[in-house]
Design a protein with these regions (language model features):
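N-terminal amphipathic/basic leader segments beginning at the initiator methionine
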Residues: 1-21
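Mg2+-dependent prenyl diphosphate-binding active-site environment of isoprenoid biosynthetic enzymes
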Residues: 21, 25-128
Length: 128
């Protein structure tokens, strides 16, 4: 991968993170608090990197790639939250899990919130 491609990937990752914040934005203080916590340490962005590579091979509008990458990361995060609920996990990525920090009900609702907001964002792609 050339320097130019790495520079483009870094820019792409930044745009995806911004899109994730946009998708999960809420005026609800509980949702905002949990979103800020979860998105502060979102992971390695492997799915985003795969979308970037895929997008560099075929001709897809950058805006759509950003939406797809953000959606893939948010769906992954929601599955991790629900997985932590099922496993009653206390720690994820060296931090307390959503269930450990906010309890069962808020963890379930937040995981569902992520799914819902993500699929709403994906639905808007279908019409473009």
């Amino acid at each position: 991968m050339s320097f130019h491609e790495v520079e483009n990937l870094t820019e792409f990752l930044d745009e995806v993170k911004l899109k994730m914040l946009n998708i999960t934005g809420s005026s609800n203080k509980n949702i905002k608090e949990i979103s800020d916590y979860v998105l502060a340490n979102p992971g390695k962005f492997i799915r985003t990197q795969l979308v970037f590579i895929y997008g560099s091979v075929i001709d897809i509008e950058k805006r759509k790639l950003i939406e797809l990458a953000a959606a893939s990361e948010l769906i992954h995060l929601s599955t991790l939250i629900h997985d932590d609920i099922i496993d009653e996990a206390k720690i994820r990525r060296n931090k307390p899990t959503v269930i450990a920090k906010w309890g069962l009900k808020k963890a379930i609702l937040y995981g569902d919130f992520l799914y819902t907001k993500t699929f709403q964002a994906l639905n808007s792609l279908e019409n473009t």
